[in-house]
Amino acid sequence: MASSNLIKQLQERGLVAQVTDEEALAERLAQGPIALYCGFDPTADSLHLGHLVPLLCLKRFQQAGHKPVALVGGATGLIGDPSFKAAERKLNTEETVQEWVDKIRKQVAPFLDFDCGENSAIAANNYDWFGNMNVLTFLRDIGKHFSVNQMINKEAVKQRLNREDQGISFIEFSYNLLQGYDFACLNKQYGVVLQIGGSDQWGNITSGIDLTRRLHQNQVFGLTVPLITKADGTKFGKTEGGAVWLDPKKTSPYKFYQFWINTADADVYRFLKFFTFMSIEEINALEEEDKNSGKAPRAQYVLAEQVTRLVHGEEGLQAAKRITECLFSGSLSALSEADFEQLAQDGVPMVEMEKGADLMQALVDSELQPSRGQARKTIASNAITINGEKQSDPEYFFKEEDRLFGRFTLLRRGKKNYCLICWK
């Protein structure tokens, strides 16, 4: 992605919600490489899909020759950003936040190159400059530059102030000052001149721009990426089970892959622009091919492959594809023990059972059938498979060979209704 027209290219992909002084920023980018940053607060032990667009934006800038700084908010994570939140966040302990900082730093690392010469990425933590700052320094050096009038007029704060059931505490009100100071610190320390973030960060970003100008007399810029929405109006990045996480222990690579496979046709080409590094020309060609093929579109598979590889690597992608293929074909011989552990985690419904159970009881316990009587009829109708093999004996008791890896048995009713038995 060429640096000189990088902003235009991001706009073509729909990746720019707002930008401060676009003309001046374009001029600055045309002069040569810049340093830029994006912040990630440790409000959980993993990043989720909502973090992926700004994180990939950092990567896009690095590919164009710029120097990315990934800032993990060890200090701001102790406070909690109130921006557009309906209620105050629960405060977490320092130990918990530090543990989350370490996890998030490790999650961010594979997306950026920390050893590529002049534009090698930097990992920073704002606890380094806030950890030992006393309250008088904070008030005199930072607080004096902020107008309360302007702060309460920021949309994110206004929404909270106008809620009868929820005001805003001083601790959250001060978050804006902390994030603003991050920008000023990174500008002084690393020459950072651009902050990128989600569109909910606009107020915090503009505060940082103002503070940097006041403290260092430097012009800096802000760019926000849009809040990702789906064509049907439902929230992006959520499933019935909650958020889609980047940590494979919280959302398995198989579940992650399936999330993208299930993208609606109305969203898939837009999401290819947001979440992959395919060129606009390649995406348009794929859309044209899908339109004229007369078959199911290929775009969802391309999207699922590209994003799963980005987040979980080639090994995670191959495991996800292997599990998908085995569930579709009914043949489980290619599945490893680790694959079954993914299924047990979140891939299919799971039930724990004691050894010695019969098939009818397993169907009831797994909620594949409402009663033993109904289970008996379904088994007799040849609609049940055990590990891909048909079983039509209602009196069937599980055998040792049904326990794959000594632990797992996969039941299927009909073509699509699965349950994994994990034997105690």
From Swiss-Prot:
Against Gene3D superfamilies, the record matches this protein to: HUPs, RNA-binding S4 domain, Tyrosyl-Transfer RNA Synthetase
Note whether RNA-binding occurs among the keywords. Answer: yes
- In chain numbering, motif 'HIGH' region lies across 42-51
Enumerate the Gene Ontology biological process terms: tyrosyl-tRNA aminoacylation
List of residues that carry N6-acetyllysine: 144
* Molecular-function annotations in GO: ATP binding; RNA binding; tyrosine-tRNA ligase activity
Q: What SMART domains does the database record attribute to this sequence?
A: S4
State the compartments where it is located: Cytoplasm
Q: Specify which residues bind ATP according to the UniProt entry for this protein.
A: 238
- Keyword set, alphabetical order: Acetylation, Aminoacyl-tRNA synthetase, ATP-binding, Cytoplasm, Ligase, Nucleotide-binding, Protein biosynthesis, RNA-binding
- Name the Enzyme Commission number(s) assigned to this protein: 6.1.1.1
The record's annotation in CDD domains points to: S4, TyrRS_core
Q: Where does L-tyrosine bind?
A: 37, 175, 179
Instruction: Cite the S4 RNA-binding domain residue spans from the record.
Output: 357-414
Name the catalysed reactions.
tRNA(Tyr) + L-tyrosine + ATP = L-tyrosyl-tRNA(Tyr) + AMP + diphosphate + H(+)
Job description of the protein: Catalyzes the attachment of tyrosine to tRNA(Tyr) in a two-step reaction: tyrosine is first activated by ATP to form Tyr-AMP and then transferred to the acceptor end of tRNA(Tyr).
Q: Which family does it belong to?
A: Belongs to the class-I aminoacyl-tRNA synthetase family. TyrS type 1 subfamily.
- Which proteins does it associate with, and in what oligomeric form? Homodimer.
Q: What is this protein's record name?
A: Tyrosine--tRNA ligase
User: What organism, scientifically named, is this protein from?
Assistant: Shigella dysenteriae serotype 1 (strain Sd197)
Give me the gene this protein comes from: tyrS
